[in-house]
Each structure stands twice: as C-alpha cells, then as structure tokens.
C-alpha cells in the first residue's frame, strides 16, 4: 500500500519555519522503555510550545498524531505507526516554583518533565505531597493523561490547573472541573461544541503542602529503594502492565496463576514482580502482546477477572510503516 512521503505530508507548511527536528521512518524502539516495536512514519521533536502549535496547525488533519513523553507506558506494535509521533520530553520541560507561602506552594511543570524530577524539585523547596511521583517512571504529561499514581496517591490529587493543546494548535488553560478523573483514567468533559477529539497536556500547576526538605527527600529515597527491591529495573519494561482490579492486585493474581517467569521469545513475565513484562534481549512487540493476551486469558479462566491493561497498545500488526 502506498503511503505519503515526508514532503507530501508537510506540503502545507514551510518547513524552514519549524525550529524542531523532523524525521521520517523513525525506529520507535529508541523512544519507548520496552525497547521494542516498529517505526513511526514521521517523528517530530518540537523546539518549544510555540513550535509545536505551528506544526499542529499545518499537519494534515487526516494524518494521525501520537504524543509521547519517555515512552514508559507504551507498546508500539511491530507494524509501526502511520502519521506522526511527537515527543515532548526533550523540550517541554520547564519546571518552576510559581508561589510559596506559609500554606504551601505552587509548582509549574511542563509535560516533558520526568515525574521523579518534579518530586525532587518539590522536596528541595520544602514542599510535600509530590514524593509519590518518584515512583512513576514517566513524565508529567503522561501522568496527567492517565492519572498515574502509587502508594495511595494520584497525580490529579495535586493538580490546580493544566494547559492543553489540540489538533489545531490552540493552547488552553483548564481546571480539574473540566475533566472526569478516575483510577488511571482522565477524560475531558465534552460539550456540544467539543468537536476536536485530540487534546494533549502540555503542562500543569501542582498545589503542594508545606513540608521539611530532609523528610521529603528521605521519603523519595525510601520509595526509590523500594522500587529497586521490588521491580525489575535492570531490564527494559513499561512498568505495571495491568491495572489493579477493585480490592485486589494484578501481580498477586498473575503469580497465583503460576505465570512468573513465563516467556515467549525474549519477552518474559518478571520473576521479581508479576505485573511487569520485561525485554530480556531482543523481544518484539508481538511477543510482548502475546504474553499480555496469555496473562489476561489465564487470570480470567482461573478467577473470572479480566485484567485491563494500564499500558497503551498502539500501531499496526506486523509488516512495516513506510
């Protein structure tokens, strides 16, 4: 099947005006933490928010757009992705203390800021409430998009407002009241005039309580130590693969089914944490997805519970994207 080349895709824009980096046929295994998957037809790293808006305004409306951060919660199928993948972590990484007083402080973090960096930044300014973010391997944009959380805390517990950008390159400021937020789920409240389905987070303001620098830093260190002991950080993975079902833990159910160490090719259910699937060498996305399917079917057959994936699975099966 013929696919548009880079020149035809960008025919509506003078690429000399773009200040970011635009590439074609980009291997996505370079950009996802599983280190597996196919190619992106086009790949763009914007220079800043203004450059991103310019790119989106002129990108063909019938061509898909996928936004990523560190790619830590993402599986790109081996057939790759049509359209364009836009990465935010390299440039949309502003991090600043907006205000601070006796009642706490307000921090702004761009979508590309790693969650652990935000946790450390808050601790260094004697603010508490963001320590749990040190346990999340992705970026602020991804954490906002899925209401990432751990140890009983969730991202949107701390959000005061956010900025977003849509397919037309329009940047808006929004509040939590504009969203339906739940466990690992965030959805923009729709109105009759909401005709743009693609809206992405570009940053957020986080309201935190006053704390003590050393106690917050110690909490971050404790959490990171726990991650090292309980998670297979020595292998490429995407973090927790499945959401925890109500009243239970996905890892316990998977282990109960005897699936720790279960392997297909170079993809394996971690022997350290059963809710992790690791790449032991040169795993393909299809091998990883086959394990996901096997785990879901085994747990459902044994318990009646159908595990829901926490990771996003996108792209085309097999083949390659030109």
UniProtKB/Swiss-Prot annotation:
InterPro entries referenced in this protein's UniProt entry, alphabetically: FAD-bd_PCMH (IPR016166), FAD-bd_PCMH-like_sf (IPR036318), FAD-bd_PCMH_sub1 (IPR016167), FAD-bd_PCMH_sub2 (IPR016169), MurB (IPR003170), MurB_C (IPR011601), MurB_C_sf (IPR036635), Oxid_FAD_bind_N (IPR006094)
Intrachain disulfide bonds: none
A single GO BP: peptidoglycan biosynthetic process
Residues annotated as the enzyme's active site: 184, 240, 310
Single GO MF descriptor: UDP-N-acetylmuramate dehydrogenase activity
Reactions that this protein is recorded to catalyse: UDP-N-acetyl-alpha-D-muramate + NADP(+) = UDP-N-acetyl-3-O-(1-carboxyvinyl)-alpha-D-glucosamine + NADPH + H(+)
Gene Ontology CC annotations of this record: cytosol
Short name of any one Pfam family annotated for the protein: MurB_C
Swiss-Prot/TrEMBL cofactor(s): FAD
SUPFAM superfamilies recorded: FAD-binding/transporter-associated domain-like (SSF56176), Uridine diphospho-N-Acetylenolpyruvylglucosamine reductase, MurB, C-terminal domain (SSF56194)
Domain FAD-binding PCMH-type as annotated: residue spans: 36-233
Key word Cell cycle present: yes
Top-level taxon of the source organism: Bacteria
Primary localization class, coarse: cytoplasm
Pathway terms, separated by semicolons: Cell wall biogenesis; peptidoglycan biosynthesis
Subcellular compartments: Cytoplasm
Keyword terms: Cell cycle, Cell division, Cell shape, Cell wall biogenesis/degradation, Cytoplasm, FAD, Flavoprotein, NADP, Oxidoreductase, Peptidoglycan synthesis
Entry EC number(s): 1.3.1.98
Function: Cell wall formation.
Family: Belongs to the MurB family.
UniProt name for this protein: UDP-N-acetylenolpyruvoylglucosamine reductase
Organism: Nitrosomonas europaea (strain ATCC 19718 / CIP 103999 / KCTC 2705 / NBRC 14298)
